């Protein structure tokens, strides 16, 4: 789209424009991301729960097919996943992705990377700013520093 007689400030740092991220995991959203997006960010019916790697891999096949059909290089489209970071909590049931020990979280990061995810957006928020800051520091020291 082009607009005339419009001023937009501040100008974006990225050239020629900021990357366009397309969200959603429906087929139309995946097709849109493949046709015009720089990054696909699947957001499903339960935004707090990321797609499992197997389902994400299936959707990436579709994304790549749509990109090729649109004449685009599928490798040029990045993939982002929101990764809610959970405290270990109750270990009697199945472990949620991005919860548990630092080793388990690192393995989750690697699993999503292996599927094709290029960006993970971690959610460190809690009701207490100090606790949020502590979670970020712990993640930085125990997960990022080793990954």
Question: PLM features: what roles do these ranges have?
Answer:
Residues 1-147:
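Active-site-adjacent structural elements that line small-molecule/cofactor binding pockets in enzymes
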């Amino acid at each position: 789209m082009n607009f005339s007689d419009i001023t937009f400030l501040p100008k974006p740092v990225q050239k020629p424009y900021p990357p366009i991220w397309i969200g959603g995991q429906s087929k139309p959203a995946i097709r849109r991301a493949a046709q015009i997006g720089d990054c696909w960010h699947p957001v499903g019916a339960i935004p707090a729960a990321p797609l499992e790697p197997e389902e994400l891999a299936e959707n990436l096949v579709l994304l790549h097919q749509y990109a090729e059909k649109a004449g685009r290089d599928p490798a040029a489209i990045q993939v982002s996943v929101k990764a809610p970071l959970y405290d270990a909590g109750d270990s009697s049931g199945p472990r949620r992705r991005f919860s548990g020990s630092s080793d388990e979280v690192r393995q989750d990061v690697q699993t999503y990377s292996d599927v094709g995810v290029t960006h993970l957006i971690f959610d460190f928020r809690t009701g207490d700013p100090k606790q949020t800051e502590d979670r970020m520091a712990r993640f930085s020291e125990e997960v990022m520093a080793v990954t």
